[in-house]
């Protein structure tokens, strides 16, 4: 019997920055090169990092840690997280970003516009690391900390940072200190952050898509909307819709393809391939309602995939089916959130042909739907 492999956890950029800061400040105080740094993470565990480098010149000290994403590496896996510390002329811990750390240019993020994209928990971890070292050596001095990531501007192109208005590099992130492999919580958090940025930048209409290809087609369908209005929800349809309503976003357009939206139409709001099977009986009933022949309805009932059903309907010229499917998606979405939104659904082929579209309103929303 095959033994299931235990996935290895990684560490956040925020924890790496705090560890590098602790080592750099220790080197500045002691005048000794450090080889490692031990730090307590937010969830209570203690972790020791081996340093990639450590140096000092009397006025400043620098230490670095290689970011290890564990068995769920992201774009920042392998990046060098560098902390440079120096004594400040004023009390307190003064944190800024250097090369390769982004700067916030749009509202809606947990860091104010104009500041380095170092999130609140990493800032707290850096503060605690500095204060721990100062207390250890009985010092009461202000400290400057600059976090940098060589190559961070290039790495950031593989992330959502440009869309979120974080320019010039990556973000220093993390709430727990560790990276849990294939964590759905992390993906959900990224959806919430993207929606908050959209709302803060005045978007009353957002477009949520199941992936990069559907987002490309969505941008072609809604060219009048700003980039931050487009959000990849992945499989988290219900979660994303509820967050839209919570944030007071009035118009939500869903754009995707047959496979996942066939599930949404059934009321399945987590559309991972393993979450729930496609109900071919449901699709057959829609086909019958759309005027398909009895033979075609039977073929739909016996189909293997939703994409196959889509091909059958296209070949038969039964395009009413797709309109009904989009209507069912809108109804399921409104039911999921308890109404109060305007919801549009567009279904595309893999090659970008729009198969169907529907718009439904539930509530007294006054949304300009001319571009829907």
Swiss-Prot record:
One of its GO terms (biological process) is methylation. Transmembrane segments: none annotated. It catalyses: Co-precorrin-5B + S-adenosyl-L-methionine = Co-precorrin-6A + S-adenosyl-L-homocysteine. It is an enzyme of class 2 (transferase). Keywords: Cobalamin biosynthesis, Methyltransferase, S-adenosyl-L-methionine, Transferase. Belongs to the CbiD family. This is Cobalt-precorrin-5B C(1)-methyltransferase. It comes from Geobacillus thermodenitrificans (strain NG80-2). The gene is cbiD.
